[in-house]
Regions:
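Helix-loop-helix
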Residues: 2-297
Length: 297
């Protein structure tokens, strides 16, 4: 197994990813936080948004990724509540990236399982700056990766490749006509939770607050499941070492959680449904992949 990648290849991949992300970062909301009228994607009627118009007036990214997903949301919303339509399309988008999710999850779980062993190797050569020691440490780490069939760089690639779908579903869920004008249990899909909580708390704002709390709980659970599964397969002494290693991971987890909650209160309510469903699907996928691919190895 070869883990050596030239700096040139890494730079090219990084540049490609940045360009792709920037291509998808089209401004779709006004100063009030609501979707701009010209950015709404309509399924039919006088305002019907065609694939050609999307490609011509916006970008290839919007035409290839955003438009199909938004129209799927609109299509399903004809036969079910818009919230259920968002849930269904979110699940479908997860299925599209499932092969990559399996690869990334398996590799990540293995990395967490061997983290205590990696820490031992690094501690063994701590303070040794000579070239021979560095090469010896790299070789020991390489042998460990090979033993558990881990390719760290492939894990990074598998994590980044689904990004276009994530950005596309992010926009599609907000821009679909059925979402902009839809409701679920009196919750307006285009409403900003923070606005509703601060101005209409006693009438409807409390419902948005409950939605945000549910979002926070599901996101937290989804982020902690991989750590729990990885530690479950460790020996007792390895668990102690893993707890130390997880301190930094926990800091990132809590930072990410706070960021998502903060973003959810200032974005259309439809995004909260998307994040809740994504978190639940992610947690279920992680558990199933662990049982099917990791535990059986």
């Amino acid at each position: 197994m070869n883990f050596k990648f030239s700096k040139k290849v890494k730079r090219l991949l990084t540049v490609a990813l940045v360009l792709l992300v920037l291509t998808g970062c089209t401004r779709i909301t006004g100063e009030d936080g609501k979707i701009l009228a010209e950015k709404i994607i309509y399924l039919a009627g006088d305002n019907h948004t065609t694939w050609k118009s999307m490609f011509t007036n916006e970008s290839w990214f919007g035409a290839i990724f955003v438009w199909p997903l938004a129209q799927l949301v609109n299509f399903f919303a004809q036969y079910m509540n818009v919230a259920l339509s968002v849930i269904l399309v979110t699940i479908l988008s997860r299925l599209i990236t499932l092969p990559l999710t399996i690869k990334q999850t398996v590799q990540s779980q293995k990395m967490q399982m061997i983290q205590p062993k990696l820490n031992k190797i690094q501690a063994k050569y701590a303070g040794k700056e000579d070239e021979q020691s560095k090469m010896a440490m790299s070789q020991e780490m390489m042998n460990l990766y090979q033993k558990y069939d881990i390719n760290p760089f492939a894990t990074i690639i598998a994590t980044f490749i689904p990004f276009p779908i994530m950005i596309a579903i992010w926009q599609a869920v907000q821009r679909a006509e059925s979402v902009v004008f839809g409701e679920f249990l009196t919750l307006k899909m285009e409403a900003l939770p923070m606005t509703e909580i601060t101005t209409n708390f006693l009438t409807s704002g409390w419902k948005y607050l409950i939605l945000i709390v549910i979002l926070g709980i599901t996101q937290f659970a989804s982020m902690k499941v991989p750590q729990y599964l990885a530690q479950k397969n460790m020996k007792e002494r390895e668990k102690k070492a893993a707890k130390e290693a997880n301190k930094q991971t926990n800091t990132m987890t809590y930072s990410m959680l706070i960021m998502i909650v903060f973003m959810s209160v200032s974005m259309p309510t439809a995004m909260s449904f998307y994040w809740i469903v994504s978190a639940i699907v992610q947690a279920v996928q992680t558990v199933l992949i662990q049982k099917r691919y990791v535990d059986n190895e």
